[in-house]
Curated annotation (Swiss-Prot):
Residues 1-16 form the signal peptide. The lineage of its organism: Eukaryota, Metazoa, Chordata, Craniata, Vertebrata. Its main location: secreted. Expressed by the venom gland. Binds 1 Ca(2+) ion. One of its GO terms (molecular function) is toxin activity. It comes from the Eukaryota. Snake venom phospholipase A2 (PLA2) that displays edema-inducing activities, as well as presynaptic neurotoxicity and myotoxicity. PLA2 catalyzes the calcium-dependent hydrolysis of the 2-acyl groups in 3-sn-phosphoglycerides. Its cofactor is Ca(2+). This is Basic phospholipase A2 PLA-N. Changing K121N: In strain: Okinawa. Keywords: Calcium, Disulfide bond, Hydrolase, Lipid degradation, Lipid metabolism, Metal-binding, Myotoxin, Neurotoxin, Presynaptic neurotoxin, Secreted, Signal, Toxin.
Length: 138
């Protein structure tokens, strides 16, 4: 019973925006964000440092930079509206923050889709301690 309670708390703790971002990734790549993009390279997932390992990791670096510019927003928790039709994601109405967060997520999902051919399994679950190059600036 305790395990079920812990799982429920963890599910509630998953930010709405991250679930939306996962759906966008699925639309553009046909892959789930979890696990394919949650700990890929040096920038996909929480935090980031060093130099992006490849084009997919660069998508995550740019996404992190996009979020960084949203100083008065909560990009990991604000819920936004969007729709899609034949592989095109369209950000909907909402607050300025919601629209900007949606655009950051949309751009990253599109970037992932454009770089599917160069995705390397060796960078899945890449250990942070191997990200030793100087960190790039946004």
């Amino acid at each position: 019973m305790r395990t079920l309670w812990i799982m429920a708390v963890l599910l509630v703790g998953v930010e709405g925006n991250l679930l939306q971002f996962n759906k966008m990734i699925k639309i553009m790549t046909k892959k789930n964000g979890f696990p394919f993009y949650t700990s890929y390279g040096c920038y996909c997932g929480w935090g980031g440092r060093g130099k992006p390992k490849d084009a997919t990791d660069r998508c995550c670096f740019v996404h992190d930079c996009c979020y960084e510019k949203l100083t008065d927003c909560s990009p990991k928790s604000d819920i936004y509206s969007y729709s899609w039709k034949t592989g095109v994601i369209i950000c909907g109405e909402g607050t300025e923050c919601e629209k900007q967060i949606c655009e950051c997520d949309r751009a990253a999902a599109v970037c992932f889709g454009q770089n599917l051919r160069t995705y390397k399994k060796k960078y899945m679950f890449y250990p942070d301690f191997l990200c030793t190059d100087p960190t790039e600036k946004c």
